[in-house]
């Protein structure tokens, strides 16, 4: 409603058509629930179930405008896990924007609730205030392995170097007191 300007039925038809079409070209289709964190939960559950039935293997829940706080994001992921009957056939993913400075916290809340993929960027680079910073996500998960017992294949010794490479390539300086790097 907020971003797509389509009726609920038009959105459902678009999901079925687009995911089915994408499956003609690849088995690994990721579907994103545009503006998901401001969507009615019952309707979101319906869209996620349809996307999975249409062939999506990853369900991405974006906080498109960086509006959500961690307790809300956690509840969204928990609700999807508890109410979408075929959720076990897909990987739940997060894609959080940093407009309120909560992208990393929301992403981690999603993981703690059951999401298994985080979409993030080096230095948090992204539109408007940016996205969840990869280096912060990785180090938080590594440091707080007691709460998030998951691993990545990221060589943490290279995070600072990667940060500098991205900064030099984009021309966006890294703030002097940036967390982690």
Predicted regions and their residues:
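Alpha/beta enzyme core
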Residues: 1-92, 107-115
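Hydrophobic alpha-helical scaffolding
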Residues: 8, 34-37, 66-70, 96-100, ...
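Conserved thiamine diphosphate
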Residues: 19, 24, 139-151
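Glycine-rich phosphate-binding loop at the start of an alpha helix
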Residues: 45, 101-105, 131
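Beta-strand segments within the central parallel beta-sheet cores of soluble alpha/beta enzyme folds
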Residues: 61, 90-96, 120-123, 151-159, ...
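Small-aliphatic-rich amphipathic alpha-helix that forms the alpha element of a beta-alpha
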Residues: 98-121
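Mobile "lid/hinge" segments at catalytic clefts and subdomain interfaces of large enzymes
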Residues: 123-147, 181
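A mid-to-C-terminal "edge-of-domain" accessory segment
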Residues: 145-181
């Amino acid at each position: 409603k907020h971003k797509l300007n389509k009726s609920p039925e038009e959105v459902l038809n678009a999901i079925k058509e687009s995911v089915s079409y994408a499956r003609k070209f690849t088995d690994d289709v990721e579907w994103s629930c545009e503006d998901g964190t401001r969507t009615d939960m019952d309707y979101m559950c319906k869209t996620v179930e349809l996307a999975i039935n249409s062939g999506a293997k990853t369900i991405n829940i974006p906080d498109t405008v960086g509006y959500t706080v961690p307790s809300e994001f956690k509840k969204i992921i928990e609700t999807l896990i508890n109410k979408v009957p075929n959720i076990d056939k897909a990987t739940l993913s997060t894609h959080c924007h940093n407009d309120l400075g909560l992208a990393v916290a929301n992403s981690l809340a999603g993981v703690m609730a059951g999401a298994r993929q985080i979409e993030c960027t080096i230095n948090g680079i992204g539109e408007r205030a940016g996205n969840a910073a990869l280096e912060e996500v990785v180090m938080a998960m590594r440091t707080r392995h007691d709460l998030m017992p998951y691993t990545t294949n990221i060589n943490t010794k290279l995070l600072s170097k990667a940060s500098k490479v991205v900064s030099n390539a984009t021309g966006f300086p890294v703030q002097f007191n940036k967390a982690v790097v």
